[in-house]
Amino acid sequence: KTCEHLADTYRGVCFTNASCDDHCKNKAHLISGTCHNWKCFCTQNC
């Protein structure tokens, strides 16, 4: 099962899923990331 949560350490407006995904994978060491309503959300196992 996976859960999504707001990436508090992501800076700025989330325009592209690629930048959010990169942040979640490389900075937060989570599965992936996507933009929702201009915010970056990371996906993790829960």
From Swiss-Prot:
Gene3D superfamilies reported for this sequence: Knottin, scorpion toxin-like (3.30.30.10)
Disulfide linkage: C3-C46, C14-C35, C20-C40, C24-C42
Source superkingdom: Eukaryota
SUPFAM superfamilies linked: Scorpion toxin-like
PROSITE patterns attached to this UniProt entry: GAMMA_THIONIN (PS00940)
Annotated function: Possesses antifungal activity sensitive to inorganic cations.
Family membership: Belongs to the DEFL family.
Protein name per UniProt: Defensin-1
Lineage: Eukaryota, Viridiplantae, Streptophyta, Embryophyta, Tracheophyta
